[in-house]
């Protein structure tokens, strides 16, 4: 029915953000996981909901954060989150090198200060840490991986990081080559509204969820907001106001003509055979 049954918030205040230098903003991914575990346990206890009553799991997360993990899915550094501006010069240089035409037609955005540019900063400034990296993920991908034990991502997630080539429907070889990113860092790409993975034994023990519970959805907070407000098909326009004010408009046309005015990402229901931006 879409009716909320129960809610839990952990912690009661915002998760702390670390800023070692002016313009930096980081959070440790393990804190997200810790609070997810605590919130899930609290929700199950206070609501009297049995774990076996939960049919599937969806995750909404802060967009654009960079998470690098080793083969055991342990973070190799704190996440460089959305409001960290250190990567801006890398994005500006990539835009100049790749050209406005490529960025408009393939990326639908300037690389800017998005996730790919944040990774370029790590490659340039922390090469030893980069060399130890097994997979790159967005914040929601990390939480799903901790639940399931399987690193995965989505096209909508890759697009918010400006990793995705929409014209060829694959990761952008030109961008990866420019930033010298190893494409093997990209996890398995899965669709939303499908069984992406299931909660592992470890994930169940940590959260109180039932082992085998399907994970079927993940999306950044803004596209998730758009979807929950009813933006599902081309022509839908919705808006939200809060910490930021955002207007969302959906289209099925591949166009980056508004490159300097708006951000264009794959919507949560994007599929190569049924595009939605």
Identify the residue ranges that each predicted region occupies.
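Gly/Ser/Thr-rich active-site cleft segment
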Residues: 102-220
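N-terminal glycine/serine-rich phosphate-binding loop of ATP-dependent small-molecule kinases
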Residues: 1-77, 93, 132, 187-188, ...
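Glycine-rich phosphate-binding loop of actin/hexokinase-like ATP-binding domains
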Residues: 66-71, 75-93, 133, 137-172, ...
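Acidic-glycine-rich active-site phosphate/pyrophosphate-binding loop
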Residues: 6-14, 89, 192-206, 256-267
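Short, hydrophobic/amphipathic alpha-helical packing segments
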Residues: 33-41, 116-119, 220-223
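Short glycine/proline- and acidic residue-enriched helix-loop micro-motifs
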Residues: 21-26, 100-109, 272
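A generic secondary-structure signal
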Residues: 39-46, 121, 125, 229
